[in-house]
UniProtKB/Swiss-Prot annotation:
Native source organism of the sequence: Kluyveromyces lactis (strain ATCC 8585 / CBS 2359 / DSM 70799 / NBRC 1267 / NRRL Y-1140 / WM37) (Yeast)
Gene name in the database record: DUT1
Protein known as: Deoxyuridine 5'-triphosphate nucleotidohydrolase
Record lineage: Eukaryota, Fungi, Dikarya, Ascomycota, Saccharomycotina
Family: Belongs to the dUTPase family.
MF-aspect GO terms: dUTP diphosphatase activity; magnesium ion binding
Cited SUPFAM superfamilies: dUTPase-like
Amino acid sequence: MTESLSNSLKVQLRSADAKVPTKGSTTAAGYDIYASQPGVIPARGQGIAKTDISFTVPVGTYGRIAPRSGLAVKHGIQTGAGVVDRDYTGEVGIVLFNHSDKDFQINKGDRVAQLILEKIVEDAEIVVVESLEETQRGAGGFGSTGKN
């Protein structure tokens, strides 16, 4: 496989309503993903935004479906179930949670999430140990490193 193909994000448009993911700026971390059909995410509920796209991420990465900050701040919309493995080739649906008290209308062509390509360690060796090396933090979790 050539270097250029292994670093490619291959996108399949599954209908005439599907759109290729785009970046909002040249240095944006994520690619905006678009809804291919209208829909409603009910108040305090959840639903799936249809995209009519499939994609294969570059070698050594996985796709993380992340929220769009504007939807989160203005409408209380968050994403869920956001891991797309390299070997998944089906349609990518976007799980959306509506944390607001108003139904959220999705229109065809709306940007509903962003795709972030993250590097992964493939085939990490799992080693069972009796104990872990002590660290300054130790077992402290959830807010243990400070107040703010």
